[in-house]
């Protein structure tokens, strides 16, 4: 008999359808700098870029997919005859307790997720923050609590925030939000334009400028203080990072003006401004309102000297290059990956300006991202380098390089970088360059301000935003990969503000088969964490967390991947102590070896799988498939290569480069009388192999999906002959071929994606109560099929418009766990009581 969970779905969806060595702590990828970040970018890129049609409009496809989903939901709502439905409930992390900072052993701090921008309205005492894909949140109690404001908007990727007021009426601030994250990581989603609120974020209109900004990131946005109907914005590459799409078809990047309060936007086409430069940052001159400054990048244009600092003296109409022309600013010889600008009025008729660049170090002239800062004390007429700040963004200028000049105090300037160099694991002295620095003498010297012993906290790595509270001297707020912090004394002490801010970017998660509401998940730059019924998730292990698994028989056995890199680190973290352990064992590919080839091709987040039949057998994927038997019970677990060392991700022509495994699934053998397991593997270049002899040999079984990334493989728990694949890609096809199905144990495959929009499908899960019902987590939300993949319908009540990266059945019980990339985790549970009293 159907439970209430299934009956409600049937009512709503059926109607709609008719319409190595063990170490104490693994290396932090933030300390590996650009090399490791580029691997994370490549991992994300492979799941979203059409490998055959590089001009395909991937971010435009995302917006189209979201609109298709919303149209289907409108039909669904109109068709419903009952008002009740199961609703996805947020379950955190809010926050992650004991989270990782550069000195986590001494100062474990609550963390939330990547905060890209911050803006403050002093009239309402309101702080607004924008998440990487978490949308806009507001706090009116100085960060004690947070409320999401934009969950239903077309993009939750935030690139810029601007607040405008014509008076001090409470609740009447005008807020502009530029969508599309501008931090130039491949998981920086593109946006859809500019949204506007005239009631301090209670309601929104837009998106405006969709034709100009769709698929881009609005990296800088400012309201003219002399004319609030005039706005200036700069747009960047947007979808999926700095160089993740070759020559995409998208609107031109550049500098834009609006003269009607943000409703329409016009690209600046002055001959002095080269076409299609990417904008990085924008400010109105602190002293002269008709002067504007914009930092620009060439990125994929191959014309490095054209990027840099541009100035307008006619209120944004025309712009001139300052690099190489203004005294003290060097001519560029390499393409800059990012540039930052900020400034303040010195009170004597001049603007004090600071420009941070991703220039190379002097001993590595061909490599960018070293970091230099130039200062002008005469409104940009002349400049001088601040040599004390050399290397301030620590090799990651493309990702984190903020500078903030304290308003009305030309002597105080703050800088942000990647990580806390020079801090020993247990309270060693701080040295510069550092994650966060302050100068009290205009940049002659800098001091590091990362630790806060008196408040028992420390800053997280990767700084993205630094702002002052208007009118409050020395009060600053910062946003980084771990969330939000506040200081009221210029960074000497810090107050952690990651309370109810649910913006965690999950990569993978799992559920406990024996205990309800016990989950485990890996996150971007915030480690691997656990859930045991409270929205505050305890932090369990460090680094970047990827695949995360709970032993379904012995639930204290936990295993997960960190980041992986060929010839650097390949391995797993694990514990047999459950959530009580705060430090995992780290098993690498080096002496004493774990059996995995150190030079293997491997994804940044390598796939893991615990055997369905033999719970202590762990599978690990590179281009080869490895298995470790008795993994948790062995004193020194090691992996052995399966399939006689067969490459299970060989190159797909016309490419000559092989891929890496991305998905693993096992099931009791489908061959009658055979005790051997059936094993499936999928790769990032679309290869699918099967073994029916427990891994002795493999045969390729699906060659019809055009090389698209295999994100998940699911064997139907009610019929092992039925197998599904999730393909993570924008395919440009209708139907999109992002779900494939086999009814003969994986021997042959057919498309099963009718009704899905053209968008990456990241995860699949069976319905916990009804055979033949399958759920799919995508980049634009959740979809469900009640006919074994025949047709699909959106099901998103309570879910923000965010990408779902993993999806698991919660056992025991009848719940589904959805782990998102930017809004934390959500649970769809049959324990919810509806207004009409519907129950099991």
Q: Which residue ranges define each predicted feature?
A:
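Boundary at the C-terminal end of the N-terminal hydrophobic targeting segment
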Residues: 19-23
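Beta-propeller blade termini and top-face loops
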Residues: 24-830
């Amino acid at each position: 008999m159907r439970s209430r969970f299934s009956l409600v779905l049937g009512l709503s969806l059926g109607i709609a359808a008719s319409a190595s060595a063990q170490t104490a702590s693994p290396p932090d990828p933030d300390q590996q700098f650009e090399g490791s970040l580029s691997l994370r970018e490549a991992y994300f890129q492979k799941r979203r870029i059409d490998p055959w049609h590089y001009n395909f409009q991937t971010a435009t496809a995302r917006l189209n997919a979201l609109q298709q989903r919303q149209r289907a939901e409108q039909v669904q709502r109109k068709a419903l005859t009952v008002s009740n439905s199961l609703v996805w409930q947020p379950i955190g992390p809010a926050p992650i307790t004991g989270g990782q900072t550069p000195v986590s052993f001494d100062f474990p701090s609550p963390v939330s997720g990547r905060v890209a921008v911050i803006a403050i309205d002093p009239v309402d005492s309101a702080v607004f923050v924008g998440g990487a894909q978490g949308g806009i949140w507001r706090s009116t109690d100085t960060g004690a609590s947070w409320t999401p404001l934009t969950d239903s908007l077309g993009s939750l990727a935030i690139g810029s925030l601007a607040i405008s007021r014509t008076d001090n009426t409470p609740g009447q601030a005008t807020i502009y939000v530029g969508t599309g994250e501008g931090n130039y990581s491949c998981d920086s989603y593109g946006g859809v334009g500019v949204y506007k609120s005239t009631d301090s974020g209670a309601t929104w209109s837009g998106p405006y400028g969709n034709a100009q900004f769709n698929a881009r990131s609005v990296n800088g946005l400012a309201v003219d203080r002399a004319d609030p109907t005039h706005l200036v914005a700069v747009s960047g590459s947007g979808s999926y990072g700095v160089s993740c799409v070759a020559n995409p078809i998208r609107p031109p990047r550049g500098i834009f003006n609006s003269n009607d309060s943000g409703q329409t936007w016009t690209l600046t086409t002055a001959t002095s401004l080269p076409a299609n430069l990417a904008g990085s940052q924008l400010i109105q001159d602190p002293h002269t309102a008709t002067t504007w400054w914009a930092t620009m990048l060439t990125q994929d244009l191959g014309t490095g000297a054209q990027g840099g600092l541009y100035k307008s003296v006619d209120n944004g109409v025309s712009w001139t290059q300052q690099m190489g022309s203004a005294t003290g600013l060097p001519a560029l010889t390499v393409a800059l990956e990012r540039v930052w600008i900020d400034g303040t009025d010195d009170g004597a008729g001049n603007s004090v300006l600071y420009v941070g660049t991703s220039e190379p170090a002097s001993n590595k002239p061909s490599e960018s991202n070293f970091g230099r800062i130039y200062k002008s004390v005469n409104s940009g007429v002349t400049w001088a380098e601040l040599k004390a700040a050399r290397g301030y963004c620590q090799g990651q200028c493309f990702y984190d390089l903020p500078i903030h000049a304290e308003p009305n105090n030309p002597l105080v300037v703050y800088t942000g970088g990647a990580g806390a160099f020079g801090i020993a694991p247990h309270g060693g002295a701080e040295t510069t360059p550092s994650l966060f620095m302050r100068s009290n003498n205009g940049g002659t010297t800098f001091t590091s301000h990362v630790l806060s012993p008196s408040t028992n906290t420390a800053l997280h790595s990767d700084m993205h935003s630094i702002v002052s509270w208007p009118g409050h001297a020395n009060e600053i707020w910062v946003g980084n990969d771990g969330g939000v912090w506040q200081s009221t004394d210029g960074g000497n002490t810090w107050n952690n503000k990651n309370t109810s801010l649910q913006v965690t970017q999950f990569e993978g998660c799992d559920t406990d088969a024996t205990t309800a509401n016990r989950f485990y998940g890996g996150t971007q730059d915030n480690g691997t964490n656990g859930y045991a019924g409270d929205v505050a998730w305890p932090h369990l292990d460090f680094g970047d967390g990827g695949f995360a698994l709970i032993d379904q028989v012995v639930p204290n056995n936990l295993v997960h991947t960190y980041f992986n890199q060929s010839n650097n680190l390949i391995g797993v973290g694990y514990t047999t102590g459950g959530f009580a352990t705060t430090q995992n064992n780290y098993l690498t590919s080096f002496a004493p070896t774990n059996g995995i080839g150190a030079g293997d091709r491997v994804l940044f987040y390598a796939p893991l799988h615990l055997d369905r039949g033999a719970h202590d057998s762990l599978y690990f994927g590179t281009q080869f498939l490895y298995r470790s038997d008795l993994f948790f019970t062995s004193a020194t677990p090691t992996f052995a290569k399966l399939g006689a060392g067969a490459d299970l991700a060989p190159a797909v022509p016309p490419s000559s480069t092989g891929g890496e495994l991305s998905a693993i699934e096992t099931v009791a053998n489908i061959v009658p009388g055979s005790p051997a397991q059936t094993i499936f593997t999928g790769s990032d270049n679309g290869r699918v192999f099967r073994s029916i002899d427990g891994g002795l040999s493999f045969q390729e079984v699906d060659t019809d999906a055009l090389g698209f990334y295999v994100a998940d493989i699911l064997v139907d728990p009610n019929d092992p002959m039925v197998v599904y694949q999730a393909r993570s890609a924008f395919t440009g096809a209708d139907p999109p071929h992002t779900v494939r199905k086999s009814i003969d144990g994986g021997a042959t495959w057919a498309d099963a994606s009718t009704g899905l929009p053209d968008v990456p499908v990241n995860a699949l899960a069976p319905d916990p109560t009804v055979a033949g019902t399958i759920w799919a987590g995508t980049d634009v939300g959740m979809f469900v099929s009640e006919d074994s993949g025949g047709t699909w319908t959106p099901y998103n009540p309570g879910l923000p418009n965010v990408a779902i990266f993993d999806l698991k059945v919660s056992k025991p019980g009848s719940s589904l766990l959805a782990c998102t990339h930017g809004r934390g985790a959500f649970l769809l549970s049959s324990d919810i009581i509806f207004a009409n009293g519907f129950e099991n």
